[in-house]
């Protein structure tokens, strides 16, 4: 293989690297044409796809944010309803316990009254029976006394 060395002096002598002839303008025109073709074929569709994806993502983020706000509102609403329901349940339980205690107290009071009446009735019945027995015994004592007296009188007479 043969190597050819470029003589740097020969490039500089005839205008060299900075020779402004038709080639430079053709390359510039070619660059502009390639840029516009790439812009039409490649960059615009890609930028449209990227923009549409950004819009899609933005819409989804907005929807997600809206759904999150709605979910938070519903959560707060249901938590308040739950707190209210718990308070009502506690109130109902307390009321039921109070009513049950009042009912039990009323039943106990009624049973005590009935027991007291039964005791009084029994005491009155017992008192009547006692008085009857005493009266009967007094009569028998009188009769026995009379008999003893009569026997004693008959013995002494």
UniProtKB/Swiss-Prot annotation:
Disulfide bonds: none annotated. The keyword Membrane applies. The chain crosses the membrane at residues 20-42. Keywords: ATP synthesis, ATP-binding, CF(0), Chloroplast, Hydrogen ion transport, Ion transport, Membrane, Nucleotide-binding, Plastid, Thylakoid, Transmembrane, Transmembrane helix, Transport. It is a single-pass membrane protein. It is found in: Plastid, Chloroplast thylakoid membrane. Its main location: plastid. One of its GO terms (cellular component) is chloroplast thylakoid membrane. GO terms for molecular function: ATP binding; proton-transporting ATP synthase activity, rotational mechanism; proton-transporting ATPase activity, rotational mechanism. It holds the Pfam family ATP-synt_B. InterPro entries: ATP_synth_b (IPR034679), ATP_synth_b/b'su_bac/chlpt (IPR002146), ATP_synthase_B_chain (IPR050059). F(1)F(0) ATP synthase produces ATP from ADP in the presence of a proton or sodium gradient. F-type ATPases consist of two structural domains, F(1) containing the extramembraneous catalytic core and F(0) containing the membrane proton channel, linked together by a central stalk and a peripheral stalk. During catalysis, ATP synthesis in the catalytic domain of F(1) is coupled via a rotary mechanism of the central stalk subunits to proton translocation. Component of the F(0) channel, it forms part of the peripheral stalk, linking F(1) to F(0). The b'-subunit is a diverged and duplicated form of b found in plants and photosynthetic bacteria. In plastids the F-type ATPase is also known as CF(1)CF(0). Belongs to the ATPase B chain family. F-type ATPases have 2 components, F(1) - the catalytic core - and F(0) - the membrane proton channel. F(1) has five subunits: alpha(3), beta(3), gamma(1), delta(1), epsilon(1). F(0) has four main subunits: a(1), b(1), b'(1) and c(10-14). The alpha and beta chains form an alternating ring which encloses part of the gamma chain. F(1) is attached to F(0) by a central stalk formed by the gamma and epsilon chains, while a peripheral stalk is formed by the delta, b and b' chains. This is ATP synthase subunit b', chloroplastic.
